[in-house]
Each structure stands twice: as structure tokens, then as C-alpha cells.
């Protein structure tokens, strides 16, 4: 999800994977 939400990855790397799914 780094490409989808690069800002979210910096704030919540773990939640970033949840957003993708």
C-alpha cells in the first residue's frame, strides 16, 4: 500500500497492510 497511501505507511506501517486488504 506504499504506492496507494505512502503517508499512511509512515504513520501506521502495520495498519497500511490492513487498508490494502
UniProtKB/Swiss-Prot annotation:
Aminoacyl-tRNA synthetase as UniProt keyword = no
Localized where?
Plastid, Chloroplast
Keywords for the protein's UniProt record, in alphabetical order: Chaperone, Chloroplast, Plastid
Note the subunit structure. Forms stable complexes with CPN60 in the presence of ATP.
Entry's family note: Belongs to the GroES chaperonin family.
**Tell me, what does this protein do in biology?**
Seems to function only as a co-chaperone, along with cpn60, and in certain cases is essential for the discharge of biologically active proteins from cpn60.
Q: Per its record, how is this protein called by name?
A: 20 kDa chaperonin, chloroplastic
Organism annotation: Pisum sativum (Garden pea)
Q: Which gene encodes it?
A: CPN21
Amino acid at each position: 500500500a506504499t504506492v496507494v497511501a505512502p503517508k499512511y505507511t509512515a504513520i501506521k506501517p502495520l495498519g497500511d497492510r490492513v487498508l490494502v486488504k
